[in-house]
Design a protein with these regions (language model features):
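N-terminal Rossmann-like dinucleotide-binding module
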Residues: 24-77
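Contiguous beta-strand/loop segments that form the cofactor/metal-binding neighborhood of enzyme cores
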Residues: 219-296, 323-335, 355-356, 372
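Beta-strand-loop-alpha-helix segment that lines the small-molecule cofactor/substrate pocket
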Residues: 98, 104-105, 109-156, 171
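C-terminal helix-rich "cap/oligomerization" subdomain common to oxidoreductases
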Residues: 28, 98-100, 328-372
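Conserved SAM-binding strand-loop segment of SAM-dependent methyltransferases
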Residues: 80-86
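Active-site loop of classical SDR/Rossmann-like NAD(P)-dependent oxidoreductases
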Residues: 41, 291, 312-324
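Predominantly a Rossmann-like dinucleotide-binding segment in NAD(P)-dependent oxidoreductases
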Residues: 156-246, 363
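Bacterial N-terminal signal peptides
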Residues: 8-20
Length: 372
């Protein structure tokens, strides 16, 4: 099952009502959320989506930069009273139930540990963090304080990826043999990301690497989900910088090979694609499927049959958007378990990325050890 939903009659009725458009979720008090950080460009997506939903109430925004606070206040016509320079100042007055983190990836551990001390659930942008040591520290804090830590990926909300997962679960593809995942775009500078976003994306101390971490995490997340949380046996990676004049400190192209018992995944994160892409190919013993984009699939089940194009069914609420999902988790209506956003899945993702970075550095294949 994609997400494990608590099996009680009221919650089943709520899910049915939400999917039918009756607005029952909207009648529940919205979850009080605060934004931490404005230096991650994905915050704009939240601010655009926020007025169109009823699951979350924005009660505060924290960023130490007065210039960034003023920029977003003006651009989104936000109440100046929402803005705070520190998390402590916000917590003293606003009492959020959950935090949405839009800082550099390198700041995630510190913020999650602070949130855990206040028993606040957290959703961060992908990836979870920049090193396995940090990921394990985050897991310790979450377990000690009994909080949920979720990782938001655009591809989690792709109906096509859910359809691929369901095909695997139903056995329609047979046993998985090879998965090829392409993620990336022309480059952050080339597509015009905000200056504050570009500054830390190209700093290995804050982003972990370049394209290797920025887009390698998508494929690692999907493959870990497809493999029911299992880590690969080995990780082999090659990175290069094809545009050193733009990205002198980090890689802009990578290939990562994950070896499992009986299967292999090839992840191709890059800041050098001709166009933006997030597509996945899965090859099994009975069939193959390509998730072309967020909704479209190409599938084929025998050598003699032609490839067919199909549209994936839409995701049901509350599995359809990040805020809908977050609200359900905070309300204890949904348990992330070992799914795409879950902490357990994403500790494995960081284990893969950490090993890939080491493999690229040394030129050697890295054998993974069991997590503590």
């Amino acid at each position: 099952m994609f997400f494990r939903i608590v099996r009680t009659l009221p919650l089943i009725l709520a899910a049915i009502a939400a999917s039918s458009g009756s607005g029952l979720y909207a009648q529940t008090a919205p979850v009080r959320v605060a934004i931490i950080g404005l230096e991650h460009g994905h915050v704009t997506g939240f601010l655009h989506a926020f007025p169109l939903q009823h699951d979350a109430e924005l009660v505060g925004i924290v960023d130490p930069s007065a210039a960034l606070r003023a920029k977003y206040e003006a651009e989104y016509h936000l109440d100046p009273a929402l803005f705070y320079p520190t998390l402590d100042a916000l917590l003293a007055e606003r009492h959020p139930e959950a935090l949405l983190v839009y800082t550099s990836i390198g700041e995630h551990r510190r913020i999650i540990e602070e949130a855990a001390a206040h028993n606040l659930d957290v959703m961060v942008e992908k990836p979870l963090t920049i090193s396995l040591d940090d990921a394990l520290a985050i897991r310790r804090a979450a377990r000690e304080h009994h909080i949920q830590v979720m990782v938001n990926y655009e591809t989690t909300w792709y109906a096509s990826n859910r359809a691929v997962y369901d095909m695997l679960q139903q056995g329609r593809l047979g046993e998985v043999r090879k998965v090829v995942i392409h993620d990336g775009h022309q480059g952050p500078k080339e597509i015009g990301v905000q200056p504050e976003f570009l500054q830390w994306l190209t700093d290995p101390a804050q982003n972990g690497a370049g394209a290797l971490y920025d887009f390698g995490c998508y494929g690692a997340d999907l493959m870990t989900w497809f493999m029911h949380g299992a880590a690969p046996i080995t990780v082999t990676a090659v990175t290069q910088t094809d545009k050193p004049q733009i990205y002198p400190r980090v890689d802009d192209d990578a290939t990562i090979i994950l070896r499992y018992s009986g299967a292999q995944a090839v992840l191709m994160p890059s800041w050098n694609w001709t166009f933006g892409r997030k597509d996945t190919e899965v090859y099994g013993t009975k069939g193959e499927v390509v998730a072309v984009n967020s909704t479209q699939l190409r599938e084929r089940f025998s050598e003699s049959s032609p490839e067919e194009s199909v549209t994936a069914p839409p995701l049901p609420a509350p599995e359809d958007t990040s805020l809908h999902y977050l609200a359900a988790v905070v309300r204890h209506q949904l348990d992330p378990g070992h799914d795409l956003t879950s902490l357990d899945t994403n500790v494995v993702v960081v284990q893969i990325l950490d090993a890939a970075r080491e493999s690229a550095r040394t030129g050697r294949t890295v054998t993974l050890r069991p997590l503590p």
